[in-house]
């Protein structure tokens, strides 16, 4: 519910100071409540805030961030987060992966999971996806009607085709399609491949990724190229970037550029930067723009494929002042971190390993930028970094990478207090 609203609710769970209730009917509506743009919103679990005015969505997320820092991190004295308003609230996602299922009478369902369920909501258009992805999805739907392939997303059953992943180049218009199955189905996919090549979706590659294991990982270790190539190109911070089919790359390119440029601005205003350490460097989207500014950069990435693509991306852009190390950050960082380094941390949602935080507070690099996609783990990690009073938070910047959802990206800049 939004401020000022009145509603009829059903109490589902109650404690002394807490009640969890389900909404039955809104009696008095807030002017901040809007009509969802998506016709599937009431069922689909992909978005959770389409009923809220977009700018107020960001205000809610900012409050959740502040609450996490105060309640989880037990932080009392930190600067007010700066809000960077997103450039677009819809059609921003450059990648999506859809579970697939054949109904008993042969119809193929492609979509997203229903809220709090493993049932697939059949969608034909998603307003947060890049238009090119929606176009490719529409083409795939039509082709699958005439070319039946056994499909079942449920890892407990035999399956066949499990997921369809579509990635688009926002600035290059390239499209890459990956069919994920629990065994090779490339022979079954060839008729589909031929028709997709003849469509207007600008497809540069069609792949079959094989994921035979009964777990929740979408992609497996083996990918077969059916046609074209297994990557796309895009422009990122004026650099040419190669992105693999299973590579991690921020789904909102425009907002990711804003975050990188914010880090560049912080670095440009500091003195005597000897080198930059980019922990969790991925395919080099942070390291390469920073190296192009003339800094010496070391990128650390444990994923083999991402590491190899990062090297290729540096070569494509003729960057000579960068070194990529295919290493575990927790084991490798203690060997190279120096007090005058500028350390950039961009970990997965689970945050930093406690042993890595111990290394940081022991070796004490003078500057730290921590980019986080999870306010809860960010708050936890900051409390551990700050507990010995060796660092001060200089700035907190919030980016809305994921409009229409509760997710938030946060950049925290810390500076060492002691020499």
Curated annotation (Swiss-Prot):
<feature type="binding site">
    <location>
        <position position="250"/>
    </location>
    <ligand>
        <name>S-adenosyl-L-methionine</name>
    </ligand>
</feature>
<dbReference type="InterPro" id="IPR012340">
    <property type="entry name" value="NA-bd_OB-fold"/>
</dbReference>
<keyword id="KW-0949">S-adenosyl-L-methionine</keyword>
<keyword id="KW-0479">Metal-binding</keyword>
<keyword id="KW-0004">4Fe-4S</keyword>
<keyword id="KW-0411">Iron-sulfur</keyword>
<feature type="binding site">
    <location>
        <position position="346"/>
    </location>
    <ligand>
        <name>S-adenosyl-L-methionine</name>
    </ligand>
</feature>
<dbReference type="GO" id="GO:0046872">
    <property type="term" value="F:metal ion binding"/>
</dbReference>
<dbReference type="GO" id="GO:0070041">
    <property type="term" value="F:rRNA (uridine-C5-)-methyltransferase activity"/>
</dbReference>
<keyword id="KW-0808">Transferase</keyword>
<protein>
    <recommendedName>
        <fullName>Uncharacterized RNA methyltransferase Pro_0965</fullName>
        <ecNumber>2.1.1.-</ecNumber>
    </recommendedName>
</protein>
<dbReference type="InterPro" id="IPR030390">
    <property type="entry name" value="MeTrfase_TrmA_AS"/>
</dbReference>
<feature type="binding site">
    <location>
        <position position="38"/>
    </location>
    <ligand>
        <name>[4Fe-4S] cluster</name>
    </ligand>
</feature>
<dbReference type="InterPro" id="IPR010280">
    <property type="entry name" value="U5_MeTrfase_fam"/>
</dbReference>
<feature type="binding site">
    <location>
        <position position="280"/>
    </location>
    <ligand>
        <name>S-adenosyl-L-methionine</name>
    </ligand>
</feature>
<dbReference type="GO" id="GO:0070475">
    <property type="term" value="P:rRNA base methylation"/>
</dbReference>
<comment type="similarity">
    <text>Belongs to the class I-like SAM-binding methyltransferase superfamily. RNA M5U methyltransferase family.</text>
</comment>
<dbReference type="InterPro" id="IPR029063">
    <property type="entry name" value="SAM-dependent_MTases_sf"/>
</dbReference>
<keyword id="KW-0408">Iron</keyword>
<feature type="binding site">
    <location>
        <position position="44"/>
    </location>
    <ligand>
        <name>[4Fe-4S] cluster</name>
    </ligand>
</feature>
<feature type="binding site">
    <location>
        <position position="126"/>
    </location>
    <ligand>
        <name>[4Fe-4S] cluster</name>
    </ligand>
</feature>
<dbReference type="InterPro" id="IPR030391">
    <property type="entry name" value="MeTrfase_TrmA_CS"/>
</dbReference>
<feature type="binding site">
    <location>
        <position position="301"/>
    </location>
    <ligand>
        <name>S-adenosyl-L-methionine</name>
    </ligand>
</feature>
<dbReference type="Pfam" id="PF05958">
    <property type="entry name" value="tRNA_U5-meth_tr"/>
</dbReference>
<feature type="binding site">
    <location>
        <position position="47"/>
    </location>
    <ligand>
        <name>[4Fe-4S] cluster</name>
    </ligand>
</feature>
<keyword id="KW-0489">Methyltransferase</keyword>
<dbReference type="GO" id="GO:0051539">
    <property type="term" value="F:4 iron, 4 sulfur cluster binding"/>
</dbReference>
<feature type="active site" description="Nucleophile">
    <location>
        <position position="373"/>
    </location>
</feature>
């Amino acid at each position: 519910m939004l401020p000022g609203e009145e509603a009829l609710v059903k109490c589902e769970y109650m404690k002394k100071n807490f009640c969890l209730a389900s909404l039955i009917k809104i009696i008095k509506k807030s002017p901040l409540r809007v009509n969802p743009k998506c016709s599937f919103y009431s069922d689909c679990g992909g978005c959770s805030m389409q009923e809220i005015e977009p700018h107020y969505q960001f205000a809610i997320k900012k409050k959740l961030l502040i609450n996490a820092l105060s309640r989880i991190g037990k932080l009392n004295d930190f600067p007010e987060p700066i809000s960077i308003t997103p450039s677009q609230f819809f059609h921003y996602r450059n990648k999506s992966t859809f579970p697939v299922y054949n109904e008993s009478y042969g119809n193929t369902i492609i979509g997203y999971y229903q809220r709090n369920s493993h049932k697939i909501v059949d969608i034909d258009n998603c307003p947060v996806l890049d238009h090119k992805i929606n176009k490719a999805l529409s083409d795939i739907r039509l082709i699958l009607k005439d070319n039946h392939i056994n499909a079942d997303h449920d890892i407990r059953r035999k399956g066949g085709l499990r997921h369809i992943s579509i990635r688009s180049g926002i600035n290059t218009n390239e499209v890459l399609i990956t069919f994920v199955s629990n065994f090779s189905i490339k022979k079954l996919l060839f008729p589909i491949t031929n028709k997709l090549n003849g469509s207007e979706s600008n497809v540069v590659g069609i792949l079959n990724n094989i994921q035979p294991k009964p777990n929740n990982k979408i992609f497996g270790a083996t990918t077969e190229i059916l046609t074209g190539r297994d990557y796309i190109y895009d422009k990122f911070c004026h650099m040419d970037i190669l992105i693999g089919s299973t590579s991690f790359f921020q789904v909102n390119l425009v907002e990711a550029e804003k975050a990188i440029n914010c880090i560049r601005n912080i670095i440009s205003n500091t003195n005597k930067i000897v080198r930059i350490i980019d922990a969790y460097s991925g395919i080099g989207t942070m390291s390469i723009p920073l190296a192009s500014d003339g800094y010496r950069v070391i990128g650390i990435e444990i994923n083999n494929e991402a590491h190899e693509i990062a090297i290729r991306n540096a070569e494509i852009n003729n960057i000579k002042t960068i070194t990529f190390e295919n290493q575990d950050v927790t084991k490798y960082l203690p060997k190279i971190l120096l007090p005058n380094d500028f350390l950039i941390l961009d970990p997965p949602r689970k945050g930093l390993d406690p042993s890595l935080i111990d290394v940081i507070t022991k070796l004490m690099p003078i500057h730290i930028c921590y980019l986080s996609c999870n306010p809860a783990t960010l708050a936890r990690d900051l409390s551990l970094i700050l507990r010995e009073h060796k660092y001060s938070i200089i700035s907190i910047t919030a980016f809305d990478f994921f409009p229409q959802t509760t997710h938030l990206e946060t950049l925290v800049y810390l500076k060492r207090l002691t020499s």
